[in-house]
Amino acid sequence: MTRIKRGYIARRRRTKLRLFASSFRGAHSRLTRTMTQQRIRALVSAHRDRGKRKRDFRRLWITRINAVIHEMGVFYSYNQFIHNLYKKQLLLNRKILAQIALLNRSCLYTISNDIKK
């Protein structure tokens, strides 16, 4: 049986790992086993936080819409606003509504008055 030399493959794998972990602090960027563990942990965190970012932005949009609705001075809650939007079949998602609330409040006032009728 012939001898298999795999030093290059292992070195290439560790080099890739070292490039990934180069920005980590301390032993996390120097020791191979620690780098491996930290890489797994970093990827897990990245995966988890991609979902969290979606939830956080949705919360931010809802907060912005709610703040502008309460500024109108009318006793009109966010959930009634969204409910009336669906009843009138206006297809505006929360992201677009939040942008309108931030950049063009008069437009949101108009939308709100139209769906109240």
Curated annotation (Swiss-Prot):
Pfam families assigned: Ribosomal_L20
GO cellular component assignments: chloroplast; ribonucleoprotein complex; ribosome
One GO-annotated biological process of the protein: ribosomal large subunit assembly
UniProt xrefs under CDD domains: Ribosomal_L20
Compartments in which it is found: Plastid, Chloroplast
Gene Ontology MF: a single term: structural constituent of ribosome
Domain of life: Eukaryota
Keyword Plastid assigned: yes
NCBIfam families: rplT_bact (TIGR01032)
HAMAP family given in the database record: Ribosomal_bL20
PANTHER family: 39S RIBOSOMAL PROTEIN L20
Family: Belongs to the bacterial ribosomal protein bL20 family.
Function: Binds directly to 23S ribosomal RNA and is necessary for the in vitro assembly process of the 50S ribosomal subunit. It is not involved in the protein synthesizing functions of that subunit.
Name used for this protein in its record: Large ribosomal subunit protein bL20c
Source organism per UniProt: Olimarabidopsis pumila
Lineage: Eukaryota, Viridiplantae, Streptophyta, Embryophyta, Tracheophyta
Gene name tied to this protein: rpl20
